[in-house]
């Protein structure tokens, strides 16, 4: 299997499947996917802080149109009805991780149009 084939397989996975993959890789290789914590800040004259390029879209509140929000979550994530309903029922919940700024803004607009409250982190 080539790297391109692996990336393509990952690209086609649903959010829940990606989460399971990360957990399995952490257990198999004894590593953690969480970012390391920096103890000290950058020294004066050090490199400037990098601009954030990946964003997480978090569904914070469903609002009054639960059905519309479930439809939007299904459209955005490709999840089945049951999985999308679980995401909506368990808000606040991350809908998309590692999205570009443009993609995160588009997802936020779709969910807000469906009546949800959304946060981009």
UniProtKB/Swiss-Prot annotation:
* Record has Lyase as a keyword: no
Q: GO CC terms on record? A: cytosolic large ribosomal subunit
Q: Which UniProt keywords apply?
A: Ribonucleoprotein, Ribosomal protein
The UniProt entry, under InterPro entries, shows: Ribosomal_bL12, Ribosomal_bL12_C, Ribosomal_bL12_C/ClpS-like, Ribosomal_bL12_oligo, Ribosomal_bL12_oligo_N_sf
The answer to whether keyword Ribonucleoprotein applies is yes
**Alphabetical list of PANTHER family matching this protein:** 39S RIBOSOMAL PROTEIN L12, LARGE RIBOSOMAL SUBUNIT PROTEIN BL12M
Q: Partners and quaternary state?
A: Homodimer. Part of the ribosomal stalk of the 50S ribosomal subunit. Forms a multimeric L10(L12)X complex, where L10 forms an elongated spine to which 2 to 4 L12 dimers bind in a sequential fashion. Binds GTP-bound translation factors.
Q: Provide the protein name.
A: Large ribosomal subunit protein bL12
Q: Which organism is it from?
A: Clostridioides difficile (strain 630) (Peptoclostridium difficile)
Specify the taxonomic lineage. Bacteria, Bacillati, Bacillota, Clostridia, Peptostreptococcales
């Amino acid at each position: 299997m080539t790297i391109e084939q692996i990336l393509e397989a990952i690209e086609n996975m649903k959010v829940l499947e990606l989460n399971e993959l990360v957990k399995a890789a952490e257990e198999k290789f004894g590593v953690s996917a969480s970012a390391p914590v920096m103890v000290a800040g950058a020294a004066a004259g050090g490199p400037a802080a990098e601009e954030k390029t990946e964003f997480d879209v978090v569904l914070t509140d469903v609002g009054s149109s639960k059905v519309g929000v479930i439809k939007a979550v299904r459209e955005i994530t490709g999840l089945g009805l049951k999985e999308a309903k679980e995401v909506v029922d368990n808000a606040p919940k991350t809908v998309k991780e590692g999205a570009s700024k443009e993609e995160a803004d588009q997802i936020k607009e779709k969910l807000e149009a469906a009546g949800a409250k959304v946060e981009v982190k």
